Amino acid sequence: MAKSVEGRNQKPDTGSQKLEVRSKMFSDLRRVSIVICWLAMLVFTFHACTHMVAAGDTWVAMACGRHFVNHGVDTVEPFSANSHKAGPTEEEIKTWPSWARWITDKVGLKTVKKWHPTGWINQNWLTHVIFYSLIPKSSYAYGVSFPSNALVYWKFAIYIVTVVCVYYTGRLLGVHPWLCAVFCCFAMFTGRSFLDIRPAGFSNMLVAVFLLILALTTYRNVLYIWLIVPVTVFWCNVHGGYIYAFIMLVPFIGLHLFTNCNKKWTAILYNITAWPFLFFVLSRAGLTFPTFLFSILVIVLDILLVFYKKNLVSIGWKGVYHTIAAAAAAFVATVLFNPFHLTNLTHTFVISVSEHAARWRKIHEWLPAFDWTNPVGTAKPFLVMFILGSAAFAVWAIVLLKTSTSIGRQTKRKKNISEGYQWPKIDIPIILIGALTIYMAVRSRRFIPIAAIAACPVIAMFIDQLVRSISAFINFRKNKRLAVGVMEYNLQLFIVLAGAMAVMYFGVWWGLKFKRIYLDSWPRDPKLTSMFMRMTDSGQKPFYASRFIKDNELEGKMFNSWTEGGFIAFGQEPDPNTGKTPLQLFMDGRAQAAYDRMAFELWQDIMGGGAGTAEILRRAGYRGENLTNDDYVKIGQWMDEQLRKYNVWVVLMPQLKCSVPRRSEYYDKRSYHVVQGLERNLDWRLVFFNNKQRLYVDIKTPEGKALFDGIFNGETLYPDDFHSNLIRAHGWLYYRMGIAEKKKGFDFAVKAFELNESPAPMLEIILVASKFAKLRADVQKFCEDYIKRFTENESKWAKEDGFRNRVEAGRIASYYLENVARIENNTKLVNDYLAQQNKYVSELIRLARIKRW
């Protein structure tokens, strides 16, 4: 009897134990799944940070950072002869509106200069200081190397912070951890092609931080809103994108204000603000795809605010008051705690909505997202996100409203229905902020990263609420119980295992690819091989040209490519007292921050050869002919006149501008023809070149003549023996008379090639030396020997840095030998060298494919 009682008493214990075991299994699986989620987000963040983006702005940043560290933050621009001058001056004030002149009279010019300075307004000054401070001086002291990867680590760090903020924003919106992690990964993937090492990276991160603060304010405690004060103070000093916070605070405050009013006042206030604003937008921009989307958004918000007001999330009147106060405090703080004070604010509007703002935005990154011919970044993931978000919103709205209405009617009729699930409230402010950020990205693709950051948590919220509501509805129809069904353990286990396998697959794949691209041998350069060099394509920058400028103490004014300006400034030795660089730029990538529109258009006009070059190209294009030598002489004469007009005596151009364009681009690449014209002008001589840059000087100036003569008398200094032999080869082959001198030039070219087996010395040999009959046998033997040596050492060289240069040199040599064989009517050799060329071209294509990311 005792045994039977004991046995009966043990049965409930067994059931309880099973329940505990089952509960523990679910709990353990959840913990494992969270770890996998974090690993997935880190893997996708790592992948997002590996994209290669050219870094023109990065070098500008380091030049500016050095200036600010050494001389403080001011509006005196030190790098260019054509930049804004510090002010305002009394002459400038005379051109101001009457109300501005009245204020100046009342407070005094000194006060105006302090609180609204003009000149060089560097909104990114703190980022520039951070960039410069992160780099050890040993990395750039000599000027022809840059081994530091500190800025690469900075990039990884800010985007890890970003993905953490995006994840917790989604969690605060009620999204399941798995779904939240998936959309965090998608956010990083969407913005990947736009994530580079530049000040905008801070804005991308701070958008995520800002949205997390809004979510904390809404779902945790309204006092979190005060965090925007320190965030915006930091933000306004690292990047001009801080204005995003104030723009998005307007709908955040406005919509929460509407939700706290009664239905009547909500309808009145919304309609008297939203519709006039929509009319203003349409009158300015017209009916375009982005404005059409904005119109739809205004209508949807009107419906939600009027008919579904009780279902809206609200922070209450206390939250509204705190948000208004925090926004006001943040605004005042950004003016007080910024070295440019009010100008930091007004400058943002000048470059965004002023008369000439559109002119500055005619660059690739400012163009619309869905301009598929745009070479900057890719908008395909953004298009997927856009379609997914639109579909999710539409289905979410339909299903949520339909199921809630249907269940609402039945629960009123049947009071005994068990309710365990509450229909979610609608967070209009967060939804609107996500939608507006998408609108920004549709208009300008540079905003795609922040659109992904703002929208992905919202899209995840739509899907999460959609799935939960459908599950609750099905459960209600079947069991008359309003509750979300629990996913079976085996299904959860399958999803976790599938997720783990996916994370492992992508982690291993991208890890191996990272090793191959960033850690293994680098074919594009034999020396500039750090991760930073590869990721930013900075190996193309004028390292050795800048060293040449520094060693020969060049001063005055120069003409340069837009994208090279920042590096040239950083590569010089500034005046220790003023920070002014000796050789002043014509233009650089700081654009409207440092230059007037007229200066930019002047640079464009000269870079394009003016109206004369355009007319010459138009006529040649009409005839389908190449430009003649006479055409180039005319272009060169015009260039000479323009450069002298602005006291320019140095011109530095990337080799890309000197390379013959494809036939389809021949009549459009005006910069190529401009450089060709300059080369044919006898007053402008080449004094420095390599595989990446060419530097010309005006020999009618004493400085230019001294540099040119120094090639022959040894007084002009060069960074290394390769460059000195290369320029001597050019000088002797072009300008010295007699075959003995030409032979000497050929020998210089051979020495240069032995020091750096690359295209530049090879081209000097086959394009110039081969023109002289007595050198052709030497040239032919040299090319044959190199082809043989390349074949013997190819497998070894393929594992070394700079392999691409050797392949390209081999292609050029085989091309020359093919032409020699044609002249000799040696069909076998012609076919052999054609096969060699095809092999080299295939290898170049392969290297370009496997060493890009």
Predicted feature residues:
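C-terminal luminal/periplasmic domains and tails of membrane-associated envelope-modifying transferases
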Residues: 3-6, 516-563, 573-584, 590-853
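Specific aromatic-rich, kink-prone transmembrane helix
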Residues: 61, 165, 190, 202-220, ...
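Transmembrane-helix signature of polytopic, membrane-embedded enzymes
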Residues: 166-189
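Membrane-interface transmembrane helices that cradle and orient dolichyl/undecaprenyl
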Residues: 210-225, 255-265, 301-304, 390-396, ...
